[in-house]
Amino acid sequence: MLFSAPLKSNSKKIMLLGSGELGREVAIEAQRLGLEVIAVDRYQNAPAHSVAHRSYVVNMQDKDALLEIIYREKPDYILPEIEAISIDALFEAEDKGYNVIPNANAVSKTMNRKNIRTFAAEVLELKTGAYEFVTTKEMLVSAAGRLGFPCVIKPVMSSSGHGQSVARSASDIDASWEIAKEARGDASELIVEAFVDFDYEITMLTARNGKETVFCEPIGHEQRDGDYVFSWQPMQMSEIAKQRAEDMAKKITDGLGGRGLFGVELFIKGDEVYFSEVSPRPHDTGMVTLITQSQSEFALHLRAVLGLPLEFTFYGEGASAAFKSEVHNFSPVIHVDESLFSKNSFVRIFGKPEAHKGRRLAVALVFDKAEQALQRARELITKVKDS
């Protein structure tokens, strides 16, 4: 493969649509290969903006505004890194010959829970929990009654756990309805899911380069309010369950097609595997790979996009812990205890320009046996504060 220098007439360009902490790591990997990076987001000084050659601030759901930037920059690869973007812009760009990663249809399916659930369950016939779609509170009450309690209620379009809740009884329905309606994204339709009585859930990072598919070791994770707070790798599971998880991950990613890394979320009950969701981009729980693998999920994503070999070394077990802001501040300062910087631990600061309560600002990473690493990560993250 031929490489060139950035900011030249023959440079190879990638455009990140979404410039958060995950996009920032992808941008850094692209810089290491001499690619020219254009980072786009809805707000100024997003994390990837500081490591890109050029950046833009735009309404990410404005089709014409996005297309104007794409046509101006003429990127070789367009990498959607968030869900709240204009899918019409991606389809039009793809029709014009631009390379959308993994492809516009895959992005369209995965950004909408109705599309991906019906595709997975009814087209690919993957095992899932029971579900219904509703558009009114009355329909929600009826669906919850049929599916039983507890049940999980989510907008068909939202990101990072926004708008999700668990209704444990009929008395929770009103609150769940309001939570869903306040979510960023499209809350005009909700998915109601029967609660899967799973033992644990995993992320199966799956990379495709057009010639091969590779899997990272399964990642266990802990969520609060639908958002990741801790992850560890590998998740201990039976060989049968692991093989079934890889088979399911391959089936869904083959069905979506294209190149890149996918975060496939699965529920595990004994040796049984249930499909939950899939993201066609690096996954927040996969930040643990920054310390466990020779090629992180971000490096693998870029390699897959470029069609490069996907071999990597799993260095060993580890864990990650997300730090979420405890205050609101327009110029946040993060206080990190020196104990986080050891021979087997470190911290990554995302450089977000503004903090608000619950916003993810940093991640602590620990290299050790998974159980000990997770315990240490829990301890270390308490030594990070913001003001």
Swiss-Prot record:
EC numbers, comma separated: 6.3.1.21
Any one GO cellular component localisation term in the record: cytosol
Binding site for Mg(2+): 265, 277
Binding site for ATP: 113, 154, 159-164, 193-196, 201
UniProt cross-references to Gene3D superfamilies, sorted A to Z: 3.40.50.20, ATP-grasp fold, A domain, ATP-grasp fold, B domain
Residue stretches making up the ATP-grasp domain: 118-306
Keyword Signal: no
Chain sites annotated for binding N(1)-(5-phospho-beta-D-ribosyl)glycinamide: 21-22, 81, 284, 352, 359-360
Pathway(s) annotated for this protein in UniProt: Purine metabolism; IMP biosynthesis via de novo pathway; N(2)-formyl-N(1)-(5-phospho-D-ribosyl)glycinamide from N(1)-(5-phospho-D-ribosyl)glycinamide (formate route): step 1/1
An example Gene Ontology molecular-function term: magnesium ion binding
GO annotation, biological process: 'de novo' IMP biosynthetic process
Family according to the record: Belongs to the PurK/PurT family.
Protein's job: Involved in the de novo purine biosynthesis. Catalyzes the transfer of formate to 5-phospho-ribosyl-glycinamide (GAR), producing 5-phospho-ribosyl-N-formylglycinamide (FGAR). Formate is provided by PurU via hydrolysis of 10-formyl-tetrahydrofolate.
Subunit relationships: Homodimer.
HAMAP family in the cross-refs: PurT
PANTHER family: FORMATE-DEPENDENT PHOSPHORIBOSYLGLYCINAMIDE FORMYLTRANSFERASE
Protein name: Formate-dependent phosphoribosylglycinamide formyltransferase
Origin species: Sulfurimonas denitrificans (strain ATCC 33889 / DSM 1251)
Gene: purT
